[in-house]
Amino acid sequence: MKKIIWISSYPKSGNTWIRYFLSNYFFNKKKEESSFGILNKIDKFPPNKYLENIVDKKFLEKNPFNISKYWEKVQSEIVKSDNEYIFLKNHNALLTIEGNDFTNEIYSLGAIYLVRDPRDVVVSYSNFLRNLDINQTINRVTNKNLICHISKKNSLDIEILGSWKLNYISWRDGVKKIPKIIIRYEDLIYNTFETKLKIINFLSKLLYCKVDIDQLNFSISQSDFNRLKNIENIHGFHKNENNFFNSGKTKQWTQILSKEQIAIIENEFKEEMLELGYINL
């Protein structure tokens, strides 16, 4: 039985960017010029095609957290796939909801967790959502209650996020038997080759395959942020009216957030930001 490799993160932390990189590395061996269609090689969890035949929509409408009752069932079907590799994009926290584990070592081979400075997450997330201003986005990112995010385009696309902190800690500490690697968004920008090589080394050990440096370099060039932004400007991103690849920069928060807003984020996430090198004592 094959197992799942998770590409997990809090929203706006580089998940789709890495998904594009990995899609080219593992599924574009002919080294053809790629566009956003290649992202279809890596589904977002939970994939609609597995849910639509087993879900009671009224059951979910009554309580979106009931999506947790389908997590294991969907994963048990996904691992039957004929695909050589099974990667899944995910924003869910690694939690147990009403007795339902998000995942376990039976279905999961490993996980890449992408983390980004929460001050920049707030800026990027607010820009992406559009209907929330900075203060409202800070409230969402710091909210200690579990939050269900339901896609406007697909009522079955339900994610249980938690706060930025809870999401990060859940993947850092949860299900010890699942091998994990934590990757900072900032390292993808400033140490691109070394960081992406680190990811491929991690995956190569899980998948028992050799590192292909030529394929790595090709995949890095294909997933160059400016290249993806240009493609989006010309063709759009899956008909998404919001810009998905906005700026890709770090420390945008220094120009946008007020001192009060910065203080709220840093006070709420002090321990984790220290751990990740985002603030100093």
Language-model region placement:
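PAPS-dependent sulfotransferase catalytic domain
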Residues: 1-183, 247-251, 260-281
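The conserved 3'-phosphoadenosine-5'-phosphosulfate
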Residues: 29-52, 87, 176-255, 259, ...
